[in-house]
Structures are given as structure tokens and as C-alpha cells.
A protein has these predicted regions:
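Basic, amphipathic "hinge/linker" alpha-helix immediately C-terminal to the N-terminal HTH DNA-binding motif
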Residues: 91-115
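Short, charged recognition helix plus adjacent turn
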Residues: 128
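Canonical helix-turn-helix DNA-binding module
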Residues: 58-90, 94
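Recognition helices and adjacent regulatory flanks at domain boundaries
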Residues: 1-29
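Alpha-helical linker/hinge and terminal dimerization helices associated
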Residues: 47, 82, 111-123
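Generic detection of well-ordered alpha-helical segments
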Residues: 39, 43, 77, 106, ...
Length: 128
């Protein structure tokens, strides 16, 4: 389903930012996304879904050295609650659960790409 809603242009956005009226609430429109992505593991887990269309808990655990089972479970639950990923449980023995991007999560891929390009451009200036 294609989104037909018209959004402001970049130039309109910059003008509204300077006037302090980007959203009806008057706050930064990026804040909700940044709040959803807070935490050490969320962006790393989302990156895994860029690699795999769907992934199981064990695959994610294997690909994310250092993450505990509890932290991975909590991260997946929070990303699901925020609507960025889905959880599908199959009625099989042994039980099987797979995770993947929702449409809203998949819509973040161009955003992640832009952030990656910015990171490469400024990598020598970043103090990590």
C-alpha cells in the first residue's frame, strides 16, 4: 500500500524548524524515533533484519556476540511493541518463532542508509 500523504519538502521543513513549528505539538518530529532506538542493542538487532528477511532467536544470538538471552528477549519485545518488527510463532514441535521487519520497520531502511552515509563521511571526526 503506497503512502499518498503529502509531506513538507526539505526547504519547508528548514523554514518551519527556524519558526519552531515543525509539528502540531511543537516538538522535534525525530524524537519519537530516537526514543524507540535508544539502547545498546536495538540498532544492532535491526541491522540483523537488514541481512535476514526473517530471523530466529538463536540466529540473532549467534550474530550478536555479547548480548545476553534476557537482553535479546527484552530488545525484541520492545521493538515489537514499537511496531518495528513482528513476531510469528508457528504451531510446531519443537516450537519455532521468527522475527522480521514490519512495514514501518522496513520504511526505516532509507533512514539507516542516510545515517550510514553520514557516518562514513564524518568517521574521522567522530569520537567514539
Amino acid at each position: 500500500m503506497e503512502d499518498k500523504k503529502e509531506y513538507m519538502s526539505y526547504d519547508e521543513y528548514l523554514t518551519k524548524v527556524k519558526d519552531g513549528i515543525v509539528t502540531d505539538q511543537g516538538n522535534c518530529p525525530v524524537t519519537p524515533l530516537l526514543l524507540m532506538l535508544q539502547g545498546k542493542w536495538k540498532t544492532q538487532v535491526l541491522y540483523e533484519f537488514c541481512i535476514y528477511d526473517r530471523a530466529r532467536f538463536g540466529q540473532l544470538k549467534k550474530d550478536l556476540p555479547g548480548i545476553t538471552n534476557t537482553m535479546l528477549s527484552n530488545t525484541l519485545r520492545e521493538l515489537e511493541e514499537d511496531g518495528l518488527i513482528f513476531r510469528e510463532q508457528f504451531n510446531e514441535i519443537p516450537p519455532r518463532v521468527e522475527y522480521g521487519f514490519t512495514e514501518m520497520g522496513r520504511d526505516l531502511l532509507p533512514v539507516f542508509y542516510s545515517i550510514m552515509v553520514w557516518g562514513f563521511k564524518h568517521e574521522n571526526d567522530l569520537h567514539l
